[in-house]
A protein has these predicted regions:
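A polyanion-binding, active-site-adjacent surface
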Residues: 1-144, 152-193
Length: 194
């Protein structure tokens, strides 16, 4: 988006490759990851995500931003990695199917780097569908539902959550407790390690 001080490039994943949990979001937010260069950093969704990761011992800090409103350099992840179905800022903040297809190879590489039996958390239906496409599964065989767990043929476990967007939390489609419950389900079934 050509704004001064913005990262405005494809946003790379954050966290160690091959971690036991891969969190897949939708796309970089206009004034979030598009500005900071880190997934879920600088927008409301990131505040909920990183505070939840910190609560469960998966992040060293709850705050994605530092005092200068930049990506918190002291924040690191343990046992998890964060990526998006689309790596670039989409028009109107919603990716088109062609963009999802274009970026799906990157997501397939992320999935291939995961250890056997790893967990994948899809934040929203678009991320859910992108994970299924990248892992060569049919969407009709794995219906999206909040806090659902799907066993994929490649040994991965796919978990679903409503996206942690401001809209979903303001409308109470997703509450903090509901989001925490998803992480509790994941941690119940997986020992997360870097």
């Amino acid at each position: 988006m050509g704004q001064p001080g913005y990262f405005a490039k494809p946003v790379p994943s954050f966290g160690e490759p091959g971690s036991s949990l891969l969190i897949v979001g939708l796309a970089p937010g206009m004034h979030g990851a598009n500005r900071t260069g880190r997934p879920f950093t600088g927008d409301y969704a990131g505040n909920l995500l990183y505070s939840t990761l910190h609560k469960y011992g998966l992040a060293t800090a709850a705050e994605p931003l530092d005092a200068n409103n930049q990506a918190n350099a002291r924040l690191s992840l343990s046992g998890c990695r964060i990526t998006n179905a689309v790596r670039c800022l989409p028009p109107q903040n919603k990716p088109e199917p062609a963009e999802i297809r274009q970026c799906n190879g990157y997501l397939a590489q992320e999935l291939a780097a995961l250890p056997q039996g790893a967990a994948v958390l899809a934040l929203g239906t678009i991320a859910h569908a992108a994970v299924l496409r990248a892992s060569n599964h049919k969407a009709k065989d794995f219906k999206f539902a909040h806090n659902a767990r799907h066993e994929l043929a490649n040994g991965l476990k796919l978990y679903d959550s409503y996206h942690c967007s401001r809209y979903n939390t303001q409308t109470k489609r997703l509450t903090d407790a509901m989001f925490h419950q998803v992480f509790e389900s994941i941690l119940e079934h997986h020992k997360l390690r870097s």
